Amino acid sequence: MRATLFCLCLCLLGTVLPTPVSLPARARGNCPGQHQILLKGCNTKHGFYIFQYIYSHLMQKNQTQVKKEEGDHQGTIHGHWLGKVDGEAPGQGAGSSHVPEDKDSPKTHSHITPASKGEGRALRPGIGDSNSVYPTSTSVEGSGDMGSILLGEIINGEDGLPQSTHPGGPHGDGDGGNGVLVDGAVTAGRERASGSEGAGSEGGSHAPVPDQGQAGTMGTGDSAITSVTDSAITSVTKKEDVHVDTEGIDEFAYIPDVDAVTITRGQDGETHISPEDEVKIFIGRANIQVGENDSSVGSAGATSEANVIPTVVTVRPQGHPEESATMATLHHGDSVTSRPVGHPSVGNSGDGATEIHSGQELEAPSPWESTGGDATVTMAVGVQSGKGRSGQRALGKHSLPATMTTRGGRGTASSGLTTGDCSTAASTPSRKGSHVVSAGQGESGEVGTAGPERQRARVQQEVAPARGVVGGMVVPEGHRARVQQEVAPARGVVGGMVVPEGHRARTQPEVASAPSTVGKAAPERHRNRAQQEVAPVPSMVVETVAPERHRARVRPESARLGQAARPEVAPAPSTGGRIVAPGGHRARVWPGAAPAPGVVGVARPAPSKAYNGDKRVAIGKSTDVPRDPWVWGSAHPQAQHTRGSTVAGGFAHLHRGQRLGGLTEMEHSRQVEQVRHADRLRLHERAVYGLSGVGGPLQPPAVHTDPWSADSSQSSEGRWGSHSDSHEEDGEVRGYPYGRQSL
């Protein structure tokens, strides 16, 4: 009966479990206690390795006497849990032998089952499992001295490769959770399957008993003994004192070139690692394989030659986009060698440590392959360079980059390595420039070159600008000079305009402007925009000076050039070609009239109420305006009417030397007022342009001062009778609406 049940258990377990790979022969007998060294990552070019070191040093444990319940025979299954996480389980391993026990024997024999070749005995956590200590369970019959339980210790020269197996698939895709291989039993999540076995010869029955997640504590462990009989199940719990010397999980980086070990997680006092003994042994002889990430498990059901536990290796050669492959070959009875293709200089040292010379380069990757009894695993990491993407290609769920800086072929690993799958990258200068790649960066955006700061000069479609409309315009900061659509001004409307701060010179729609609307340089933060369908007419306004909070505006709907513009206010004579809009007034050219060449809508103060002359005298009786540019027609009395009123044709032939009656008093008062305003505006302009640095007025000071001088005693005959004075040419403002007569 006993042999039958034992064979049944073996058959059941054989259908579930894979065949593990045994350690190389040189790896046996080198590690005291539990030493599980997991290769977290390496950089073969720069010569450093990153390991996860799981250790647990145990002292001898004393077992108390177990009371036996009534019954002639009982089978015991002993499981010892000493872990922090679920996923460990006791189980009866294949290859175990039991010593028959006499029922009268006061003491049974304890036996620690050795593993046969090809069967896994020790525990191996998954990659990224950083808080677990995985013991190897032992089968104990009866009571008495159980001996020492060594976690992962190599016993009798034979041990199994630490192997984790998820029932769902080779990469842990199933529902297994944290299933691990313990003594030939597979655990899935919190459910532990325990194989039971009878020790007697009379009526022993055997059945698996599930145990829901019983876990012991560090220090004193609890062991469960389950007795299975024909009649009942009797559980007897015994206490055993287990003193754990040290246990924990550390991470360290080992640099073979300098023979140095850097602890990146943990403490030096707990780790007990020296580069002379254990580290080299771990590198050369322990369970270190290099393979593809994203799994803590080997392929279930794989052969012993190709079943390799993959871990993480990331190789980052700088400046070589295609040189990114590491091929590690696990030789039976030999050490693990990282051998780039085409570089035979990489080999094994005498003590089993891998020698990787500096300056070596890696060739193109190759897929997984298994040749001639050797398990060859190749893991490739692609590197993109020169295409706006930098950093590393992280492998696995917990990619925590380590940065490596080399100086003269010697490297020093940083202390930022923590748990998880560590993909290492080296930040070294490239061969093609001072390019330093930091780990974990995503796409790097390209910063394009910007033009002049916040400046735009835009000439839009279908623009036929007039000569000097906006050309040569100097616009101070915070202002915009705009010639809007369907503008047809006369020559020089906006040309040469000087606009002080806080003002805007605007020529509104439906006024046709003349050529050269835009040919000017815009200062910072301004635009000069000549918009669509602009056909300007030359020289409508020249050098308009708009005072604070005022605008010089030309109204739309200008009619034929034969009619003069009717200004609301007109300046005093001898303006020197400069239209001055006094305070509180606006210069407007009303609809229904377009100025003749040289006739400009100008701003002037309202006439004095003392003027009582006949309108017919001022207006005249002729509505036909000759095409002489020197004819000065004006509807002066229009200013006395309401703003929107129009007077049909209001031009008189004003010949030279003719004086209108009643204009003397009005002329005197207007001149005095204009002189005052001109002085104020001139001082204001000089102050504004002196502070802003844009430049002074376009006209020299003499042009402004002489005609407008308050103490000038000469009459206006000389000024208005002469054509050579104050730069009055065809392209400039001529506009005094009372003609060129002496006063």
UniProtKB/Swiss-Prot annotation:
Classification of source organism: Eukaryota, Metazoa, Chordata, Craniata, Vertebrata
Sequence ranges of Basic and acidic residues compositional bias: 549-558
Keywords: Disulfide bond, Extracellular matrix, Glycoprotein, Secreted, Signal
Disulfide-linked positions: 31-42
Keyword Glycoprotein: yes
Tissues where this protein is expressed: In the eggshell, expressed mainly in the palisade and mammillary layers. Expression also detected in the hypertrophic zone of the epiphyseal growth plate, and in cortical and medullary bone (at protein level). Highly expressed in uterus. Not detected in the proximal oviduct, liver, magnum, duodenum and kidney.
Protein modification: Asn-62 is fully glycosylated, whereas only less than 10% of Asn-293 seem to be glycosylated.
Protein's name according to its UniProt entry: Ovocleidin-116
